[in-house]
Amino acid sequence: MTTKAIYPGTFDPLTNGHLDLLTRAARLFDHVVLAIAASPSKNTLFTLDERVALANDATQHLSNVEVIGFSDLMVHFAQQQKANILVRGLRAVADFEYELQLAKMNHHLMPTLESVFLMPSEEWSFISSSLVKEVARHGGDVTHFLPDAIVRALLEKLH
């Protein structure tokens, strides 16, 4: 049986922490969809098309990863993709309550969808897209936290 997993998020922008989880998910599952959510309720810095393009560039080296933008309910997207696994990251205890609620709701809506939680490597356990954008807005060096092309795109957007 082929395992197809979805790793969903806004990825505004995709960080090295996200790439760490994605790379590990790509080793665990036959096919992984990096599902980039439109997230109209969030005030994203990058458009959905820009986030998809940046993620495609950053994931070229992962042959079993496909980047797709979506605006559906996650379970509807999972059904369309014929995926049975949802990959989520847990950085800290604070993430757990929210992720537990999401997992329970997703399982209620689609009982065949299993949530699998991965913890980031220690090096990336404290970063988030929001934090990286905030540091960059104030002139801090974010080169360690983002792929090179995304650093350039972020700095162009902010300045």
Curated annotation (Swiss-Prot):
**What is the official name of this protein in its record?**
Phosphopantetheine adenylyltransferase
Any transmembrane segments, and where? none
- Where on the tree of life does the source sit, at the highest rank? Bacteria
Give the encoding gene's name.
Answer: coaD
Positions binding ATP in this chain are T10, F11, H18, G89, L90, R91, E99, W124, S125, F126, I127, S128, S129, S130
The record's section on NCBIfam families has: coaD_prev_kdtB, cyt_tran_rel
Q: Name one Pfam family in it.
A: CTP_transf_like
GO BP terms: coenzyme A biosynthetic process
GO MF annotations, alphabetized: ATP binding; pantetheine-phosphate adenylyltransferase activity
